[in-house]
Amino acid sequence: EQQQADDSNKEQLSQQNTDNVNIGMSVELPTEPGKKVTVMDVFFSNAQGKFYALFLVIFAVMFATADIKSGYIKNIGGQVSQRGMLIVSRAVALALFTAITFAGIFVFQAAANMLAFKYVVWGNWREIIPYFLTELTLHYAFVLICMAIAVIIKNNVISMTLSVCLTMNIMSIVYALIDYVGNRVGLHNFNIYKYTVTGRMAMLPMNVGREDVVSSMCVAAVFIIIMLSLSSYIFQKRDI
């Protein structure tokens, strides 16, 4: 019964952003008082608070525009019939970077726990694996969104600013307006936040269920396809 109560408290904490989205970054540990802080606890709180996303988007924006600013893309652009494939190659590189970064973060957090608390408790691996893979996919989709912004705008400062604003829930103002309009036209209890990548990052519970995984993966897949298609099309048509 105590274990069920702990799981229930963690799930309530993980889903608190569904109806109350704050602007800014909020990181709160789900660890129960008197219990050891697990690696999963810290990873969950940072992933939910979009701390990892903030780090990833900085690299994504710089990487997406590096070859354009250096002039390298102009040298090879004329030799490639399908320039959109250059975007696909970037997406593959970003996928590897995101996966390696996530794995490194998890290992680094274990080392940090050892230094800070003098112990390492990983957590429940049945919770860790599905949560880790789902958040990894959502973060990759978010990275591609930021890459698309950088490719379209072609300005590092503006692209970086917009990407950081996304991690800080600035779009919650727009989401609130969309929800209001949706409810006014008869879509009761409509919540656009559930259908966004950043929303799914924040709402994903620690004890993730099959429905959570499927819905989050579907949202991520839709954004991955849209961002890749949009970036490739614009890059193909644009005069470089």
Predicted stretch roles:
Residues 72, 85, 159-160, 229:
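Hydrophobic positions within alpha-helical membrane elements
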Residues 71, 89-90, 233, 238:
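Structural detector for helix-capping/boundary residues
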Residues 222-240:
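Junction motif at the cytosolic side of a transmembrane helix
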Residues 1-63, 87-157, 163-164, 168-175, ...:
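Secretory targeting signals
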Residues 60-83, 91:
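Transmembrane helix boundary and interhelical loop/hinge segments in multi-pass membrane proteins
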Residues 175-194:
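Extracellular/periplasmic helix-loop junction at the C-terminal end of a transmembrane helix
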